[in-house]
């Protein structure tokens, strides 16, 4: 060991001496003596490694208390941090999908603070069913006979198949063998549910006769899967649920549908593309319809199944139901969200998802122009800050082809270096409330469709 190396090691302080320093008193009060000591030991090991490898001291050795504070502050942050979503994707899976309505937030807080009648019947003091209140609401809205709630739509499809078709065949069009995020594939789910997939037709064309020819003594279900995250266009043919139900009645085989996103209102009345609604499929005679709670519905993550009473009863009594059931917080949020649909005239005001989806391009453009001047003044030395038209997307596999006209603030580096964009995006991710945009075509884009707290946004970006 060289004299220089010994000198560097000798500059490392003892933990006891550091702890006696007044700057560590508040750290010990905030984070606890044990955690502070653990971190100091770790930092001493790091410092020794740096000395050994590069014959120098880490820069933070000049102020140990400041480094400890920075590390413990970051460590104490929740893994689920609020962010400002300016990606242009409203229902962003990585950012938690639907924002919850205030009614849902209040319902969850109440359910967390006190015991609730989750499975308790106040009328007779007996045991109730956790799905009952929501089932009644969903039946009122969709016209179904009964309903079942699980923790997401993937679970809903798994339960639906396992409870009604295990050991038997399920007939599905080849054009509907979807894969969603996380490698969730209909053929894989069928295997897990104990079903045999019987695919019919071709990728782009499936006829009623294809289903008819596939039916045999081992057929349990005819299944439709809404292709919510892709679109097949051109020379295509698919039969709708009403036609498939008619065939199912003729052959005495139930029809079930995985609707995916699911919307309880006709979105076209808000200027959005129309999506099939559960109530339409129930009216057409479909036996079971499954859909998500946290996509177009605008509620918490949940899987909802509505349909015929005898079919729902089979789902409720299946062993998987207990493993997949929703907890009290999910049920509280979902019930509060579904209740908003009883008053559709106020829905776009009270449901954040619908409010964001229906923001007009003109309103967003005005907002962008209002923000452009102060941001250009602050960032203009390095970036050209412009207002540009863009197209938002709904996200989470909903309406994959359709885009929503919007407006964005774009930041283009004067020197054209992409590394400057990456650096700027990284700086914004370190803000108290991280701002998440997207880099595309040599610019950093901030699509303002989902920006509601304009003042907070400006305060952070102008610091």
From Swiss-Prot:
Gene3D superfamilies for this protein: 3.90.1150.180, Type I PLP-dependent aspartate aminotransferase-like (Major domain)
One GO cellular component, as annotated: cytoplasm
InterPro entries hit by this protein: PyrdxlP-dep_Trfase, PyrdxlP-dep_Trfase_major, SelA-like, SelA_trans, SelA_trans_N_dom
Cofactor(s) in the UniProt record: pyridoxal 5'-phosphate
GO MF annotations in UniProt: L-seryl-tRNA(Sec) selenium transferase activity
Localization terms from the record: Cytoplasm
Associated pathway: Aminoacyl-tRNA biosynthesis; selenocysteinyl-tRNA(Sec) biosynthesis; selenocysteinyl-tRNA(Sec) from L-seryl-tRNA(Sec) (bacterial route): step 1/1
N6-(pyridoxal phosphate)lysine PTM sites in chain numbering: 295
Reaction equation(s) it catalyzes: L-seryl-tRNA(Sec) + selenophosphate + H(+) = L-selenocysteinyl-tRNA(Sec) + phosphate
UniProt superkingdom: Bacteria
Keywords: Cytoplasm, Protein biosynthesis, Pyridoxal phosphate, Selenium, Transferase
GO biological processes: conversion of seryl-tRNAsec to selenocys-tRNAsec; selenocysteine incorporation
EC code: 2.9.1.1
Family named by the database record: Belongs to the SelA family.
Subunit text: Homodecamer; pentamer of dimers. Binds only one seryl-tRNA(Sec) per dimer.
Matching HAMAP family: SelA (MF_00423)
Summary of the function given for this chain in its UniProt record: Converts seryl-tRNA(Sec) to selenocysteinyl-tRNA(Sec) required for selenoprotein biosynthesis.
Protein name (record): L-seryl-tRNA(Sec) selenium transferase
Species this chain originates from: Escherichia coli O17:K52:H18 (strain UMN026 / ExPEC)
Gene giving rise to this polypeptide: selA
């Amino acid at each position: 060991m060289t004299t220089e190396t010994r000198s560097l090691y000798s500059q490392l302080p003892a933990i006891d001496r550091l702890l006696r320093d007044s700057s560590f008193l508040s750290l010990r009060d905030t984070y606890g003596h044990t955690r502070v000591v653990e971190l100091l030991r770790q930092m001493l090991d790091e410092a020794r490694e740096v000395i050994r490898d590069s014959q120098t001291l880490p820069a933070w050795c000049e102020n140990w208390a400041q480094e400890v504070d920075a590390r413990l502050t970051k460590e104490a942050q929740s893994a689920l941090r609020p962010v400002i979503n300016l990606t242009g994707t409203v229902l962003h899976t990585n950012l938690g999908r639907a924002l919850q309505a205030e009614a849902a937030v209040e319902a969850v807080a109440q359910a967390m603070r006190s015991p609730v009648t989750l499975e308790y019947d106040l009328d007779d003091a007996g045991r109730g069913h956790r799905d009952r209140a929501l089932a009644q609401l969903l039946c009122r809205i969709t016209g179904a006979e009964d309903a079942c709630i699980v923790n997401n739509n993937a679970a809903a499809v798994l339960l639906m198949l396992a409870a009604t078709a295990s050991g038997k065949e399920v007939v599905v069009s080849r054009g509907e063998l979807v894969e969603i995020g996380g490698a969730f594939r209909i053929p894989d789910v069928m295997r897990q549910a104990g079903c045999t997939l019987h695919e019919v037709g071709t990728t782009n064309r499936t006829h009623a006769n294809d289903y008819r020819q596939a039916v045999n003594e081992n057929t349990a279900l005819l299944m439709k899967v809404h292709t919510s995250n892709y679109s097949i266009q051109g020379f295509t043919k698919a039969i709708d649920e009403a036609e498939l139900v008619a065939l199912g009645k003729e052959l005495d085989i139930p029809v079930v549908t995985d609707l995916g996103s699911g919307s309880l209102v006709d979105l076209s009345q808000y200027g959005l593309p129309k999506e099939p609604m559960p109530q339409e499929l129930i009216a057409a005679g479909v036996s079971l319809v499954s859909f998500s709670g946290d996509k177009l519905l605008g509620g918490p993550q949940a899987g909802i199944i509505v349909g015929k009473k005898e079919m729902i009863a089979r789902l409720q009594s299946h062993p998987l139901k207990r493993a997949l059931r929703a907890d009290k917080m999910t049920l509280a949020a979902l019930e509060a969200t579904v209740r908003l649909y009883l008053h559709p005239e106020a829905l776009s005001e009270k449901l954040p998802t619908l409010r964001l989806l229906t923001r007009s391009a003109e309103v967003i453009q005005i907002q962008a122009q209002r923000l452009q001047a102060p941001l250009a003044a602050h960032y203009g030395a390095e970036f050209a800050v412009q207002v540009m038209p863009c197209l938002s997307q709904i996200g989470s596999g909903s309406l994959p082809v359709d885009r929503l006209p919007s407006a964005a603030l774009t930041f283009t580096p004067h020197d054209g270096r992409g590394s400057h964009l990456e650096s700027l995006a990284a700086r914004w991710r370190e803000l108290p409330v991280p701002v998440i945009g997207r880099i595309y075509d040599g610019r950093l884009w901030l699509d303002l469709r989902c920006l509601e707290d304009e003042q907070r946004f400006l305060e952070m970006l102008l610091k």
